[in-house]
Regions:
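ABC ATPase "signature
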Residues: 237-238, 246
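Helical segment within the ABC ATPase nucleotide-binding domain
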Residues: 192-205
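Conserved ABC ATPase "signature" region
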Residues: 69, 128-147, 256-257
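ABC ATPase NBD Q-loop/coupling interface
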Residues: 65-87, 243
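A short, surface-exposed alpha-helical micro-motif characterized by mixed small hydrophobic
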Residues: 219-221
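A short, proline-enriched helix->beta-strand linker immediately N-terminal to the Walker B motif
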Residues: 171-175
Length: 277
């Protein structure tokens, strides 16, 4: 069976400068978690945003292909017309971004923002969309889904906003989820809950997950395979436990020696929206 996603020889640059993503290749199977690991500026996020063609305006796609072998057939995402690409974003492929406050509108209630995904991609009416969103809110751990629906992002803590982003990414039941540093700025307990939530939703749906992180504890707990990046290039790839236990590349060994760890992933705990501290 073909991988769910195949990224081949991807190169991205800005202006006349050198490629900041240089010949990157990796593959992801359905139901699998692949971790992209590296320091800030290594090209992890750009590589992932290229899957959804959400690069900065000044970025140039210089080469490569991204093949998505989803349920509706295989496509090269880089050659699709923008109209067809819009139909894939947030539907068959979803992304959890690093900073929820930048991704959520401060002017609209959370429920309306998540329901918009279903109205856009599933052509649902307001009542059907609301039922589906409330169900998703319950799945991601909101004790009071209706309260979450009525809340504005600024009324929620960081952990609650991240749960909301997971709900938005998952409500259309994507085949592929990209999670870009999903636990950034969260306390250790909330980190474990968010990661446990992603893992439980993956077990339920069978989706593939690309997890962008610099935290080796996250890799050890979540990923089956790992790709290590530095300065836009792949340094090492392989089975996560093998690479963690015995890195082959000197850069990988150096990175791992300085990397932070977190406790094992806990089961997602129920939560309700509350004002941020």
């Amino acid at each position: 069976m073909a991988p769910l996603l195949e990224v081949n020889d991807l190169s991205i640059g800005f202006g006349n400068g050198p490629s900041v993503v240089d010949g990157v290749s990796f593959a992801l199977n359905a139901g699998e978690t692949l971790a992209l690991v590296g320091e800030s500026g290594s090209g992890k996020t750009l590589s992932c945003r290229s899957v959804l063609r959400l690069l900065p305006d000044a970025a140039q796609m210089r080469g490569g292909s991204i093949r998505f072998n989803g349920a509706e057939g295989a496509v090269n995402l880089l050659s699709l017309p923008e109209k067809k690409m819009r139909a894939i974003r947030g539907d068959r492929i979803s992304m959890i971004f690093q900073e929820p406050m930048r991704s959520l509108s401060p002017l609209h209630r959370l429920g309306d923002q998540v329901a918009e995904v279903l109205r856009l991609h599933r052509n649902m009416g307001r009542r059907a969309a609301k039922r589906a969103v409330l169900e998703q809110f319950e799945k991601v751990g909101f004790v009071d889904p209706m309260r979450a629906w009525k809340s504005y992002p600024f009324e929620m803590s960081g952990g609650m906003r991240q749960r909301a982003m997971i709900a938005m990414a998952m409500v259309a039941k994507p085949e592929l989820l990209i999670a870009d540093e999903p636990t950034t700025a969260l306390d250790v307990t909330t980190q474990a809950q968010v990661l446990g939530l992603i893992r439980s939703l993956q077990a339920e749906t069978g989706m593939g997950v690309i997890l962008v992180t610099h935290d080796l504890g996250v890799v050890a707990n979540m990923a089956q395979r790992v790709v290590v990046m530095n300065k836009g290039r792949v340094m090492e790839r392989g089975d996560a436990q093998e690479v963690l236990g015995s890195p082959a590349h000197p850069y990988t060994a150096k990175l791992f020696a300085a990397a932070p760890m977190i406790p094992a992933v806990a089961a997602p705990a129920p939560a309700s929206p509350k004002p941020a501290d």
